């Protein structure tokens, strides 16, 4: 199942000495044994998908935080996962960069990608999530359909949280 799951972390975890294109082709070539040309084709498609294809020849240090996170997303997509896991993908970004990354994730959701997202971005979650799990101190406090979670929270802790952020 690991081969069918892509991950995007809080930190971008890009190889600083490799170009954006090489960051995206490394795993498909080494893990999936794809020919370099095919891996580059897939990488360019995914860089286009997250709107940074024009950055392919640059190195991570030459990109903004939002561009680096979108590169990390493209890199994960190059493995053609069925499920994407996101661990606070916007937490290391400046506010103006957050929208860039969330827009790319919204596009994935609209394309039908199954995503499990750890986030504090409730507007984003409300827009794209089918189901919500609210956790506090590592414990599940509430599970609900997104509409019910926001419209009719059950636990006092969830109500308090929503009253503070909405």
Please describe what each predicted stretch is.
Residues 1-146:
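ABC family nucleotide-binding domain
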Residues 143, 147-166:
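C-terminal boundary and immediately downstream tail of ABC-type ATPase nucleotide-binding domains
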């Amino acid at each position: 199942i690991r081969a069918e799951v892509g991950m995007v972390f809080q930190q971008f975890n890009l190889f600083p000495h490799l170009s954006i294109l090489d960051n995206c082709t490394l795993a498909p070539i080494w893990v999936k044994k794809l020919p370099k040309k095919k891996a580059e084709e897939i990488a360019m498609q995914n860089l286009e998908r997250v709107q940074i294809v024009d950055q392919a020849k640059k190195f991570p240090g030459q990109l903004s935080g939002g561009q680096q996170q979108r590169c990390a997303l493209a890199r994960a997509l190059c493995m053609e996962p069925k499920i994407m896991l996101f661990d606070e993908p916007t937490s290391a970004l400046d506010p103006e960069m957050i929208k860039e990354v969330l827009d790319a994730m919204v596009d994935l959701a609209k394309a039908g990608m199954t995503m499990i997202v750890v986030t504090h971005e409730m507007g984003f979650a409300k827009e794209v999530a089918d189901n919500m799990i609210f956790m506090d101190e590592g414990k599940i406090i509430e599970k609900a359909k997104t509409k019910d979670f926001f419209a009719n929270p059950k636990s006092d802790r969830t109500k308090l949280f929503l009253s503070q952020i909405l």
